[in-house]
Amino acid sequence: MPSYYLADLRIRFTENFKGCSMPELPEVEVTLRGIKGALDGALIKSIYHSDKSLRVPMSDDLYKLEGATVTKLERRAKYILITTTKGSVLIHLGMTGHLSVLESSVPRKTHDHFEMVTGSDVIVRLNDTRRFGLVLYYDIGDDPFSLSPLKDLGPEPFSETFTPDYLYARLKRCKKSIKQCLMDNAIVVGVGNIYASEVLFESRISPLRLGCSIKKKECELIVANIQKILSSSIEKGGTTIRDFEGADGKLGYFVQNLNVYGHDNEPCRICGTNILSCVQGQRTTYYCPKCQN
């Protein structure tokens, strides 16, 4: 079987977690890498989309991609952009979406809402139970990066733009909690609920502090830890992945490396104090009151 086949590349909920958690940057990056081998340079033989609406209804313009050749695949924040000779398609996994790379003989399931079949009879299929995902078509000549929803996004966490000086300048004007600031896609993309809690723990910064109270030295810690933790999660296959399996059979399970997220009322791995939780901006925050005092 060709090396690009994945037994079933999925982004799912982890049963250990308390509450819902959507795929974050590492999980989307792992997904992108998983589909690249099947799609990069491939001819798109056919397109399918269901008549169910996702976050917005899928356009029949997606069928324009039939007969196109895929020229580029990339990630921007939590979006996957697939560029072809006949336009582009932007995919967001939403809360429960996952992409699978499958043989053409695999039948569709109830919640399979979009698929591309290549000239090699390989299917890249989107399954989305809760239908909070997104599949958008951009015509030839459109620049997706200058259009919604990509145009107002902040810098990538691994980009040259995302520096301690940049973060310090942005936080000086931020009257929200530092946790909410890190989750603001206009400040930096891809740091979702799980990783914001973990980054602040690693940086020994209380999530209850205001963004404008963060010192420049602390910004250095935050930037370094965002990059370190996201990189580690990508290497391990992500956090919200329950059963990711690559072609080599290796599993990704960064959930085992989480220090605070999902561990409320459990002892801190560093000091033994019970982890606390609170709600900030309708999302649950986890922290150690001693280590992050």
Label for each model-derived stretch:
Residues 6-9:
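Short hydrophobic targeting helices and cationic amphipathic motifs
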Residues 15-137, 144:
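Gly/Gly-Pro- and Ser/Thr-rich, intrinsically disordered tail segments characteristic of DNA damage-repair
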Residues 22-25, 157, 161, 215-223:
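Generic detection of long, well-ordered alpha-helical segments
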Residues 43-61, 74, 166, 170-293:
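Basic, nucleic-acid-binding surfaces and adjacent catalytic neighborhoods in DNA/RNA-processing proteins
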Residues 85, 89-190, 195-202, 210:
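Phosphate/anion-contacting hairpin/loop surfaces
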